[in-house]
């Protein structure tokens, strides 16, 4: 059942990432990849602990959401390819900026996601069905 959930949520996550590429794609800067990775960092840090604590969702389904949807939505490989392409185009400053914004931004988004999740958990949020 785990693989089914990962597959279903993975398809949904991949489609959402594709939609973000259509919406934000184009230009010299890989803004769509940056956006999905930062959003994914926040979602993983916020949703997973919150749902694990406050919902009746099974662990298998919860892992399907995290591994499937968020795993397919985010993309380390596109980040790596985008960075190499920027370097090959001679955009060294842009490539370094992209790396720094991705890494530092990802850590900041995880911090915000956890903080927001913890805040809701402390408030005694009701069950999510």
UniProtKB/Swiss-Prot annotation:
Positions annotated to bind Na(+): 71, 74
Domain of life where this protein originates: Bacteria
Listed GO CC annotations: plasma membrane
Reaction(s) the record says it catalyses: fluoride(in) = fluoride(out)
Membrane-spanning ranges: 3-23, 32-52, 59-79, 90-110
Keyword Ion transport among UniProt keywords: yes
Gene Ontology annotations of biological process type: cellular detoxification of fluoride
Keyword Transport listed: yes
Bilayer topology annotation: Multi-pass membrane protein
UniProt keywords, alphabetically: Cell membrane, Ion channel, Ion transport, Membrane, Metal-binding, Sodium, Transmembrane, Transmembrane helix, Transport
Subcellular location: Cell membrane
A matching Pfam family: CRCB
Activity regulation, short description: Na(+) is not transported, but it plays an essential structural role and its presence is essential for fluoride channel function.
Gene Ontology MF, one: metal ion binding
Family of this protein: Belongs to the fluoride channel Fluc/FEX (TC 1.A.43) family.
Its biological purpose: Fluoride-specific ion channel. Important for reducing fluoride concentration in the cell, thus reducing its toxicity.
PANTHER family referenced in this protein's UniProt entry, alphabetically: FLUORIDE EXPORT PROTEIN 1-RELATED (PTHR28259:SF1)
Name of the protein this chain belongs to: Fluoride-specific ion channel FluC 2
Lineage, opening ranks: Bacteria, Bacillati, Bacillota, Bacilli, Bacillales
């Amino acid at each position: 059942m785990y693989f089914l959930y990962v597959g279903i949520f993975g398809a949904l996550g991949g489609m959402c990432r594709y939609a973000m590429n259509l919406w934000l794609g184009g230009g010299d800067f890989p803004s769509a990849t940056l956006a999905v990775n930062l959003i994914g960092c926040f979602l993983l840090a916020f949703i997973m602990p919150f749902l694990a604590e406050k919902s009746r969702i099974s662990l298998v389904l919860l892992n399907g959401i995290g591994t499937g949807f968020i795993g397919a939505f985010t993309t380390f490989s596109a980040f790596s390819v985008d960075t190499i392409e920027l370097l090959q185009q001679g955009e060294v400053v842009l490539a370094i900026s992209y790396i720094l914004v991705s890494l530092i931004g990802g850590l900041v988004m995880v911090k915000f996601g956890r903080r927001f999740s913890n805040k809701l958990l402390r408030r005694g949020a009701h069950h999510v069905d």
